[in-house]
Amino acid sequence: MGGKMGSVPEQNTEKLLWQSSDVADSRDSKFRCCSWRALYEAPAKLYALGHSDRRKLYFSIKMGIALALCSFVIFLKEPLQDASKFAVWAILTVVLIFEYYVGATLVKGFNRALGTMLAGGLALGVAQLSVLAGEFEEVIIVICIFLAGFGASYLKLYASMKPYEYAFRVFKLTYCIVLVSGNNSRDFLSTAYYRILLIGLGATICLLVNVFLFPIWAGEDLHKLVAKNFKNVANSLEGCVNGYLQCVEYERIPSKILTYQASDDPLYSGYRSAVQSTSQEDSLLDFAIWEPPHGPYKTFNHPWKNYVKLSGAVRHCAFTVMAMHGCILSEIQASPEKRHVFSNELRRVGNEGAKVLRLFGEKVEKMEKLSLSLGEILKDVQRAAEALQMKIDSKSYLLVNSESWAAIKEQAEAEEARENDQEAKDDETKVIKSLSQIWDTNNNNNHQSNDQSQHWMSTESMMLKNREMWPSMSFIDGTVVNEIECKVYESASSLSLATFASLLIEFVARLQNIVNAFEELSTKAGFKDAVDQIPKV
């Protein structure tokens, strides 16, 4: 009996052990499955990476060639027999300064050379001073290292020294290595000499390989990025206008849009890419100004800054497109009937504005001047904006509270009637008229005033019948929303339409900045004369 009683916990223990082993086996099998799947998919992903942009493959090949050449030169015993122990600096130089773009390699090479030369010269001077100090040699070296580290780090924080940040790092590294290693070997001069020599060797190999073997230019990418921004903003502009007129509504706004992250929404991704390209443009600009003349950029001082300036003008227009997209995402929306009233004018402004952006994008991409005058370029879109303004002026009663508008209209008519009565009394003192004539005149004026008031109120009543965006009564959590709140919501919905229209007109006004920036760029960069003025729509 005791044996049977003791077997129960043993069976439970064995059962738990079997269950835990099953769980562990399942986890191991899932891990192995994921590992094999990752290994299986890795070659395909690597192939897709190189196939999508062959320049990435070229960059990797060039890096391998540069390292191989550097190692081959170091292995030659005759010319660099005494420098074999410093060979690592040549390889480190290739690894550190070989960059994707030619301009980036030139920038890093210049910074590394500048930092090495300054640190080597200063370290040799400090070394000679420390030797003269005798027994205080190490104290002098430590103090000088502290002063050099403090001074270089402090100067690096100065705003104008930001482009030379890498030079400061190389300076501190070279300065410390020359002093410390030279103090151990008692040969400061050879340490500085071979370090500078091998760094120069590595930098030379990097520049030759990067410039003459499948070069990748930052200026070319900057040029393409600016042209791409035009097309992206044009697509977003057309999409926003068409979406607003089609009463596009989001069932649930994506969280990525609310947090301003990358999203697949074409309306959102178009203007976002133009707005987010600021940092990329600045980086490409810093590299492009170092690059030698190449391809269509045949001048040493090519106006790369004007490309960034032109892109800034496009970005200024993209902000209005962003605000228009915000109107689509807004909770308070104008009724489809009111949007339909202004649909033709809104669509025309959107199409003409996108047409202008695409035209400038093509001209920037082809590096062509405009064959038309600057005033004619914006003529159609400005006329469309004027037509929209006139339509808003003629239909402005749709964009305000109807009762307030009617009250203002009645007050204006009453004031006009009082002015007419006052003028009639003044004329009575100057011109003698019969009482019957005065009576007939007053009756006619009052009758016309009443007819106008009745005509206005009938028009207003027809409008009130057509408005169905906001109900007169609604229920929220079992409570009745009063009529005042409904009128407030109705007025707000009308104002959203006015906001969208005003943003579109503001977009047209900002196009002039693009025209001015493009004219300046085309003049400085020497764009060729235009061949065809018909843009692709």
Swiss-Prot record:
Its main location: endoplasmic reticulum. InterPro entries: ALMT (IPR020966). GO terms for biological process: malate transport; monoatomic ion transmembrane transport. It is a multi-pass membrane protein. Residues 373-435 form a coiled coil. It comes from the Eukaryota. Pfam families: ALMT. One of its GO terms (cellular component) is endoplasmic reticulum membrane. The chain crosses the membrane at residues 56-76, 86-106, 109-129, 131-151, 196-216. Keywords: Coiled coil, Endoplasmic reticulum, Ion channel, Ion transport, Membrane, Transmembrane, Transmembrane helix, Transport. It is found in: Endoplasmic reticulum membrane. Belongs to the aromatic acid exporter (TC 2.A.85) family. Malate transporter. This is Aluminum-activated malate transporter 5. It comes from Arabidopsis thaliana (Mouse-ear cress). The gene is ALMT5.
